[in-house]
């Protein structure tokens, strides 16, 4: 669903920011 996709994208972005 759109909500799940949004959550996955947000999670990936958050993880990316933490790893930077």
Curated annotation (Swiss-Prot):
Subunit note: Octamer or nonamer in membranes. Monomer in the soluble state.
Free-text comment on this protein's domains from its UniProt entry: Composed of a long N-terminal alpha-helix and a core region rich in beta-sheet structures. Before the pore formation, the alpha-helix binds the lipid membrane, partitions into the lipid-water interface and stabilizes the monomeric molecule on the membrane. Finally, it traverses the bilayer, thus forming the transmembrane pore.
Name of the featured protein: DELTA-actitoxin-Afr1d
Similarity remark: Belongs to the actinoporin family. Sea anemone subfamily.
Any GO molecular function: lipid binding
GO biological process, one term: killing of cells of another organism
Alphabetized UniProt keyword annotations: Cytolysis, Ion transport, Lipid-binding, Membrane, Nematocyst, Secreted, Target cell membrane, Target membrane, Toxin, Transmembrane, Transport
Subcellular location: Secreted; Nematocyst; Target cell membrane
Annotated site (Part of the hydrophobic cavity (in subunit A) that receives Val-60 from the adjacent subunit (B)): 16
UniProt entry tagged with the keyword Nucleotide-binding: no
Keyword Oxidoreductase assigned: no
Activity under varying temperature: Stable up to about 47 degrees Celsius.
GO cellular component: extracellular region; membrane; nematocyst; other organism cell membrane
Functional summary from the UniProt entry: Pore-forming toxin (PFT) that consists of a crown-shaped octamer or nonamer that forms cation-selective hydrophilic pores of about 1.5 nm (inside) and 13 nm (outside) and causes cytolysis. It causes cardiac stimulation. Also causes hemolysis (HC(50)=0.4 nM). Interestingly, the Phe-16 is crucial for hemolysis.
More details: This protein has been found to bind carbohydrates, since it shows a substantial delay in elution profile in size-exclusion chromatography. The carbohydrate pocket ovelaps with the lipid-binding module of actinoporins.
The organism's taxonomic lineage, starting at the top: Eukaryota, Metazoa, Cnidaria, Anthozoa, Hexacorallia
């Amino acid at each position: 669903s759109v909500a799940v996709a949004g959550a996955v994208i947000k999670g990936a972005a958050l993880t990316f920011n933490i790893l930077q």
